[in-house]
C-alpha cells in the first residue's frame, strides 16, 4: 500500500514540476541545478541559480566558524566554499553573456551590494585558493599566512622608504638652486672686485702683478690685426689675380698644341653676361632657327 502511495506522490511531483515549468516558475532546488551553466538559456533561471548559490555560501560561511568542527570537517567545508565561489563566478559570466547584469564589476548597483561585496572579499588567498573562518587557523595555513603578512609588511616598508627618499630629494631640489652648482659664479655678487672690473682693468691687474706687459688688451690686438694683417690679405688677393692672368695667357698660348694642361685654370676673370645680353642672344638664336626652318635667305 505504501509503495502505491509513493508512486502516486512521485507522479504528482513530476506533474507539478511540469506545470511549474509551463507556468514559468523558476527552479530553486539545489539538487536540480545543472552542472554546466551553458545548458540554461533563460536569464531569470540563471539569476535564480546564482541566488541559491549565494544562500548556500552564506550558510557554509556561518558553519565553518563552529568551534566543534574538527580539522577534516573544516577542510571539507572550505573546499565546498571554494567550489561554490567558482560556480557563482561561472553563473555571473553566463548571466552577462545572456544580456543580464555585470555582477563582476557593478555589484554596487544592486540591492544586495553590501552582502555580495562582503562575500567576494572574505577569506584569505594563497596561490589562488581561499581559506575561510577556522580554516585560516589550521597550522600549515597559519604559517603561510604569517609569511605572507611579513612579506606584505616588508613591501610596505620598502614603499614607505622610497616615498621618504623622493620627498627628501624634492626638498633638496627646492632648497638647492643653480648657484649651489656654480652656475652663477661669474656673476657679480658685490664681494669680488676683480669680477666687477671690466676687461681692461683685469688685464692691467694681471700685468701689474707679473711686472711686465704679458697680456695685451683685446682692442690693441684688433688694431694691430687691422693695421698689419689686413694689408697681407690684400696682397694675397692681388697675387691670386696676377697668377690667374698668367695661367689664362698660358692656356691661350697652348690652345693649338695636342697636349693641353688639364690643371690649367680657365678664365675666371671674364665678366658674367647681363640679363639683357642673355635675352638678346636667345632672341637671335630663335630668329636664326626660324629663318632656317622657313628657308628664307637673308
Swiss-Prot record:
Keyword vocabulary terms for this entry: Cytoplasm, mRNA processing, mRNA splicing, Nucleus, Spliceosome
The keyword Cytoplasm is assigned to this record: yes
Cell compartments where the protein resides: Cytoplasm; Nucleus
Keyword set includes Transcription: no
Alphabetical GO biological process terms: generation of catalytic spliceosome for second transesterification step
GO cellular component: cytoplasm; spliceosomal complex
Membrane-traversing stretches: none
Xref: InterPro entries: Helix_hairpin_bin_sf, Isy1, Isy1_sf
Predominant localisation class: cytoplasm
Pfam families reported for this sequence: Isy1 (PF06246)
Subunit and partners: Associated with the spliceosome.
Role description: Involved in pre-mRNA splicing.
Record-stated family: Belongs to the ISY1 family.
The protein's name: Pre-mRNA-splicing factor ISY1
Species whose genome carries this gene: Debaryomyces hansenii (strain ATCC 36239 / CBS 767 / BCRC 21394 / JCM 1990 / NBRC 0083 / IGC 2968) (Yeast)
Gene: ISY1
Amino acid at each position: 500500500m505504501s509503495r502505491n502511495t509513493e508512486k502516486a506522490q512521485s507522479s504528482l511531483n513530476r506533474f507539478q514540476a511540469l506545470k511549474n515549468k509551463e507556468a514559468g516558475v523558476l527552479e530553486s532546488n539545489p539538487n536540480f541545478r545543472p552542472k554546466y551553466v551553458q545548458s540554461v538559456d533563460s536569464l531569470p533561471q540563471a539569476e535564480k541559480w546564482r541566488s541559491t548559490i549565494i544562500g548556500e555560501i552564506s550558510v557554509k560561511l556561518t558553519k565553518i566558524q563552529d568551534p566543534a568542527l574538527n580539522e577534516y570537517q573544516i577542510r571539507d567545508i572550505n573546499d565546498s566554499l571554494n567550489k561554490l565561489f567558482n560556480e557563482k563566478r561561472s553563473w555571473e559570466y553566463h548571466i552577462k553573456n545572456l544580456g543580464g547584469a555585470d555582477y563582476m564589476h557593478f555589484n554596487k548597483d544592486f540591492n544586495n551590494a553590501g552582502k555580495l561585496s562582503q562575500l567576494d572579499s572574505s577569506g584569505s588567498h594563497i596561490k589562488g585558493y581561499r581559506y575561510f573562518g577556522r580554516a585560516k587557523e589550521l597550522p600549515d595555513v597559519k604559517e603561510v599566512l604569517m609569511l605572507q603578512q611579513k612579506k606584505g609588511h616588508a613591501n610596505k616598508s620598502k614603499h614607505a622608504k622610497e616615498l621618504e627618499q623622493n620627498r627628501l630629494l624634492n626638498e633638496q631640489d627646492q632648497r638647492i638652486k643653480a648657484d649651489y652648482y656654480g652656475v652663477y659664479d661669474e656673476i657679480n655678487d658685490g664681494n669680488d672686485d676683480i669680477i666687477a672690473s671690466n676687461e681692461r682693468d683685469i688685464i692691467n691687474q694681471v700685468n701689474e702683478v707679473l711686472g711686465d706687459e704679458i697680456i695685451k688688451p683685446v682692442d690693441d690686438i684688433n688694431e694691430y690685426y687691422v693695421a698689419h694683417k689686413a694689408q697681407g690679405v690684400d696682397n694675397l688677393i692681388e697675387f691670386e689675380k696676377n697668377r690667374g692672368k698668367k695661367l689664362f695667357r698660358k692656356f691661350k698660348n697652348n690652345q693649338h698644341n695636342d697636349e693641353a694642361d688639364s690643371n690649367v685654370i680657365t678664365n675666371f676673370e671674364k665678366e658674367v653676361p647681363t640679363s639683357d645680353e642673355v635675352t638678346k642672344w636667345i632672341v637671335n638664336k630663335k630668329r636664326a632657327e626660324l629663318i632656317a626652318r622657313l628657308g628664307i635667305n637673308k
